[in-house]
């Protein structure tokens, strides 16, 4: 594949991926509108926030892609916070900062832990993940546990899916795009992990 073909492949992927990941979180831009926004156009009657969510998610994906192409290293807290910082680039007071208030997860019965426990829980999660060689199963479980913790005030879903793709691509696989049309299956898989610690259903979405 030529460099131009590779760039076109990722351009097409990031448009659909950005649309789906943002739509899962409530962004109302259509796929075509997302494509136009990523080309620098403004969509009439759509809020600035939704435009920024699109461009910032794209930028976060290309940051992740750069990490994959760079010197291999284990997942760490600094990388997670940097990905989140790009996703929430328009909110300097919140980006890359663990939340300091209670939150609820859209579409989930699980109640995230008290914010005071987040630094410890994230440290333990990262230590657990890096304690063995990564696999798709381990990536899926990391994602489920990350979403349970819900460490940030906003952007947890988008950030969590970007982290999953970082780790998937580090294994040599193509990035995964969980479709907006499959959001119920995605939420159900997360809820199933909350209730049973069974990750197979979620793992199938990362293939």
Whereabouts are the PLM-identified features?
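FIC/Doc superfamily catalytic core
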Residues: 1-154, 158-207
